Swiss-Prot record:
Pfam families: NADHdh. Belongs to the complex I subunit 1 family. This is Formate hydrogenlyase subunit 4. Residues 24-67, 115-131, 189-221, 275-284 are cytoplasmic. Residues 1-2, 89-93, 153-167, 243-253, 306-307 are periplasmic. It is a multi-pass membrane protein. GO terms for biological process: anaerobic electron transport chain; anaerobic respiration; formate oxidation; glucose catabolic process. Keywords: Cell inner membrane, Cell membrane, Membrane, Oxidoreductase, Transmembrane, Transmembrane helix.
Length: 307
């Protein structure tokens, strides 16, 4: 059971990831007064792509071909350790904060260098922008989660979630500021406007995707959808853990599952509302905005020292 449960959780998240992307697309269309493609359109697109031949540039190497599978594999690994219906991590051995952040860094690293491996200047520029965005957002996420870890006295995600679940009043200010910083970082990591647009594979920001086609592109799209879901679930599971089970029961599992679905759907709709109220930023303006998120993380750190 201890091995089966995290595997089932990862596979379920993998299966529903395109559905959450579909809900986002429908919400965006409704906010634009359009009908939209339907919540299952992501599945149709991916299935169609998986049935086609994957063709890459002549100059591309093994990194370009391997990256889609690395993206999916890394995100599935992270998904096994996230608290979804329980307060504790289903796989405590993998549920260390530093380990999870390194896994996210591996996925970003491969995504960036896959753009450099094509020999195309267009994808290379997109890869450099992706790397720069990572430099801006990862310190914010790391510092925010580290403050929460210091409050919990452990870097294990189960202990952090349990501490937030019981919410120590004496540490409310650091936790609230850390929550704001991580919410900011989550928004950026999910590839949303004004920083990015996850469906814009023909544009410069998503340049590394422009050379993929067929089954490779389908796997990559599924991996990006899974990354968005995993990033959102990590934030929701750690900082909004209420409704998750402390002890495993059949009735509690059903209730926790319903609450988890509601939290994810509400999160997706709130993010869609925010991103559709803003225009995309120029790259040179992006660092000025991300400083606000890092400011929340730094204030959380200072308030932790002062507490």
């Amino acid at each position: 059971m201890s091995v089966l449960y995290p595997l089932i959780q990862a596979l379920v998240l993998f299966a529903v990831a395109p559905l959450l992307s579909g809900i986002t697309r429908v919400a965006r269309a409704r906010l634009h007064n359009r009908r939209g493609p339907g919540v299952l359109q992501e599945y149709r697109d991916i299935i169609k792509l998986l049935g086609r031949q994957s063709v890459g540039p002549d100059a591309s190497g093994w990194v370009f071909r391997l990256t889609p599978y690395v993206m999916v594999g890394v995100m599935l690994t992270i998904a096994t350790a996230l608290p979804v219906v329980t307060v504790g991590s289903p796989l405590p051995q993998l549920g260390d904060l530093i380990t999870l952040l390194y896994l996210f860094a591996i996925a970003r690293f491969f995504f960036a260098i896959s753009g450099l491996d094509t020999g195309s200047p267009f994808t290379a520029i997109g890869a450099s922008r992706e790397a720069m965005l990572g430099v801006l957002v990862e310190p914010m996420l790391l510092l925010g989660l580290w403050v929460a870890a210091q409050v919990a006295g452990s870097t294990n995600i189960s202990n952090i979630t349990d501490t937030v679940y019981h919410w120590p009043l004496s540490q409310s200010i650091p936790l609230v500021l850390a929550l704001c910083a991580c919410a900011f970082a989550t928004f950026i990591e999910m590839g949303k406007l004004p920083f990015d647009l996850a469906e814009a594979e023909q544009e410069l920001q998503e340049g590394p995707l422009s050379e993929y086609s067929g089954s490779g592109f389908g796997v990559m799209k599924w991996g990006i959808s899974l990354k968005q879901l995993v990033v959102l679930q990590m934030f929701v599971g750690v900082f909004i853990p209420w409704g998750q089970m402390e002890t495993f029961t059949a009735g509690g599992l059903l209730l926790a599952l319903v609450i988890a679905i509601v939290k994810l759907v509400v999160g997706v709709l709130v993010i869609a509302l925010f991103e559709n109220s803003m225009a995309r930023l120029r790259l040179d303006i992006t660092p000025r905005i991300t400083w606000a998120g890092f400011g929340f993380a730094f204030l959380a750190f200072v308030s932790l020292l002062a507490a």
